[in-house]
């Protein structure tokens, strides 16, 4: 695609007197995976609804696949595949029938729809489940079927709303492998997720929003270097406040989340020496990651 597949410029949305999206601007480049991150209530769902033309913005401009939204949202959606947060597969149909029926919504002939099914089943690794009812599938199988269904129109853009929520680690990794294969085919992906590892593995760039405003944007590694820039020691114990007071002089910065104290350090040795042999304490020394960035930017954990 020669134009930006997704472009938001100074978009605002109000519900009653509450501004839920506040001057949001970002664009997604062709062939990239772009992550939209934020806590519950940050405005992610409203942003996706406006992108798809389901909800109309009060100010700003949106384009999807080169089409202005909402005025030509219906045309734009012909080139978009959507994986919703919650599966909305038809439980009365088999796996094969779910794909066939959805293909007809895009105007495909019965012959063309039937021709699509085998490669989509292969992509989703569901060949052996073609004639199974949806209720017979595992959670991971349902998510892969929903992803395959989103591909029936060979979309330029995929919009994925928390695609691996509720999946076990094995199913999540298989879903990630399928998404990477789509990126290798040149698909553009807009992804919302509560899993920082997922965002770090898949996203070329990401945008963190809070209360409808963009508070950070960039490549995952760039954000980690810019916002954290050092190692992290996680300390689990009964009195994190007391630990913070004791260890703060030896850290660049400290944060408390629940019962965990995070110490951001350039030199970990002084803290290691003070923790060694302490009863009732567990600690982990690791490189900084996107979860640390989120904690730094918002002051709280991501919530499911």
Swiss-Prot record:
Write down the superkingdom of origin.
Answer: Bacteria
Enzymatic class: translocase
Q: Which UniProt keywords apply?
A: ATP-binding, Cell inner membrane, Cell membrane, Membrane, Nodulation, Nucleotide-binding, Translocase, Transport
SMART domains associated with the record: AAA
Write one Pfam family the protein is assigned to.
ABC_tran
- State the membrane topology: Peripheral membrane protein
The EC code for this enzyme is: 7.6.2.-
* Domain named ABC transporter: residues: 6-236
Q: Which PROSITE patterns match?
A: ABC_TRANSPORTER_1, ABC_TRANSPORTER_2, NODI
The entry marks the following residues as binding ATP, namely 38-45
GO terms under cellular component? plasma membrane
Localization terms from the record: Cell inner membrane
Molecular function terms from GO: ATP binding; ATP hydrolysis activity; transmembrane transporter activity
Q: In terms of one coarse class, where is the protein primarily found? A: membrane
Establish whether keyword GTP-binding is in the entry.
no
**Subunit:** The complex is composed of two ATP-binding proteins (NodI) and two transmembrane proteins (NodJ).
NCBIfam families under this entry?
A: nodI (TIGR01288), PRK13537.1 (NF010060)
In the record, the note on similarity to other proteins reads: Belongs to the ABC transporter superfamily. Lipooligosaccharide exporter (TC 3.A.1.102) family.
What does this gene product do?
A: Part of the ABC transporter complex NodIJ involved in the export of the nodulation factors (Nod factors), the bacterial signal molecules that induce symbiosis and subsequent nodulation induction. Nod factors are LCO (lipo-chitin oligosaccharide), a modified beta-1,4-linked N-acetylglucosamine oligosaccharide. This subunit is responsible for energy coupling to the transport system.
**Name of this chain's protein:** Nod factor export ATP-binding protein I
Species per Swiss-Prot/TrEMBL record: Burkholderia mallei (strain ATCC 23344)
């Amino acid at each position: 695609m020669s134009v930006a597949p997704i472009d938001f410029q100074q978009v605002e949305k109000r519900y009653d007197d509450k501004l839920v999206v506040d001057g949001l601007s970002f664009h997604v480049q062709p062939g990239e995976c772009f992550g939209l991150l934020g806590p519950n209530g940050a405005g992610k769902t409203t942003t996706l609804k406006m992108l798809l033309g389901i909800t109309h913005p009060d100010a700003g401009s949106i384009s999807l696949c080169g089409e202005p939204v909402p005025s030509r949202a219906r045309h734009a959606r012909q080139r978009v595949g959507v994986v919703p947060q919650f599966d909305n597969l038809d439980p009365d149909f088999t796996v094969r029938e779910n794909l066939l029926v959805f293909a007809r919504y895009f105007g495909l002939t019965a012959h063309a729809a039937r021709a699509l099914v085998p490669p989509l089943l292969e992509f989703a690794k569901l060949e052996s489940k073609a004639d199974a009812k949806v209720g017979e599938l595992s959670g991971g199988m349902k998510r892969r079927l929903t992803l395959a269904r989103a591909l029936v129109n060979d979309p330029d853009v995929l919009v994925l709303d928390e695609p691996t929520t509720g999946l076990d680690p094995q199913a999540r990794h298989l879903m990630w492998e399928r998404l990477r294969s789509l990126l290798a085919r040149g698909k553009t992906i807009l992804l919302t997720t509560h899993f920082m590892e997922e965002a770090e593995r898949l996203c070329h760039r990401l945008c963190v929003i809070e209360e409808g405003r963009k508070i950070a944007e960039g490549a995952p590694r760039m954000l980690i270097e810019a916002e954290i820039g050092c190692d992290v020691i996680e300390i689990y114990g009964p009195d994190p406040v007391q630990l913070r007071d004791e260890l703060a002089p030896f850290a660049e910065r400290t944060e408390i989340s629940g019962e965990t104290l995070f110490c951001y350090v350039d030199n970990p040795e002084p803290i290691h020496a003070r923790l060694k042999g302490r009863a009732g304490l567990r600690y982990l020394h690791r490189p900084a990651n996107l979860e640390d960035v989120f904690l730094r930017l918002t002051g709280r954990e991501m919530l499911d």
